[in-house]
C-alpha cells in the first residue's frame, strides 16, 4: 500500500508496474521474477493483462491468509499467469503458532 503512488505512476503510456513486468519478461525465466500482492487491484496498477497473458516469469504473491486473499481465488486473480504464482501466507502461518501450522497447511492445500 505504501508504494501505490509510485507503482501506478505513468512512464509514458504504461504504469511503473507494467514497465517492471515488461522488463522482467525480457530478462526471462530463471533470472528474474516479480512481486504482485494477491490483494491488489490489477486494473489500478495497469497490469490486468496478466489474467489473459502468461507472464513467463515467477510471481511471488504475498497477501494470502491473514491479509485476506484466498488461495481458492488465485486463478481468478492471476488468470493465465496463475501457474507461475508462488503464494505467500507466512503471516497466517506464524500467527497460527507451532501447534496449528500443520492444520493450516492442510487446509491451504485443499483450497488450491
Name each model feature, range by range.
Residues 2-3, 67, 94-95:
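Short, acidic Gly/Pro/Ser/Thr-rich loop/turn segments
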Residues 5-10, 45-48, 71-73, 97-99:
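Short, well-ordered secondary-structure micro-motifs
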Residues 22-29, 76-80, 110:
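Generic secondary-structure signature for well-ordered alpha-helical cores
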Residues 34, 39-88, 92:
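A C-terminal functional module that forms or caps the active site or interfaces directly
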Residues 93-111:
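Non-catalytic structural scaffold of enzyme domains
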Amino acid at each position: 500500500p505504501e508504494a501505490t503512488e509510485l507503482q501506478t505512476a505513468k512512464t509514458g503510456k504504461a504504469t511503473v508496474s507494467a514497465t517492471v513486468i515488461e522488463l522482467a519478461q525480457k530478462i526471462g525465466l530463471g533470472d528474474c521474477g516479480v512481486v504482485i500482492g494477491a490483494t491488489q487491484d490489477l486494473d489500478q496498477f495497469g497490469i490486468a493483462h496478466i489474467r489473459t497473458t502468461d507472464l513467463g516469469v515467477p510471481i511471488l504473491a504475498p497477501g494470502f491468509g491473514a491479509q485476506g486473499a484466498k488461495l481458492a481465488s488465485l486463478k481468478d486473480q492471476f488468470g493465465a499467469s496463475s501457474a507461475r504464482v508462488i503464494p505467500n501466507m507466512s503471516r497466517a502461518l506464524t500467527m497460527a503458532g507451532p501447534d496449528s501450522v500443520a492444520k493450516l497447511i492442510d487446509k491451504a492445500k485443499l483450497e488450491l
